[in-house]
Curated annotation (Swiss-Prot):
It comes from the Eukaryota. Residues 14-45 are annotated as: Required for DVL/RTFL small polypeptide activity. Small polypeptide acting as a regulatory molecule which coordinates cellular responses required for differentiation, growth and development, including leaves shape, pedicule elongation, inflorescence organization and fruit maturation, probably by restricting polar cell proliferation in lateral organs and coordinating socket cell recruitment and differentiation at trichome sites. The chain crosses the membrane at residues 17-33. PANTHER family: OS01G0525701 PROTEIN, SMALL POLYPEPTIDE DEVIL 1-RELATED. This is Small polypeptide DEVIL 2. It is a single-pass membrane protein. Its main location: membrane. GO terms for cellular component: plasma membrane. The lineage of its organism: Eukaryota, Viridiplantae, Streptophyta, Embryophyta, Tracheophyta.
Length: 45
């Protein structure tokens, strides 16, 4: 039987992993949006 401490540790690990995945997704979105904005700004003819 697992102790409460090890259970909480596992819970924290999964939360941080979830947060990391979320942040990585957001970074990707921001990068894509920045690229689009730069292209729009730089492509004025």
């Amino acid at each position: 039987m697992e102790s409460i401490m090890s259970l909480k540790r596992k819970e924290k690990k999964s939360q941080s992993r979830r947060l990391g995945k979320y942040l990585k997704e957001q970074k990707g979105r921001i990068y894509i949006i920045r690229r689009c904005v730069m292209m729009l700004l730089c492509s004025h003819d």
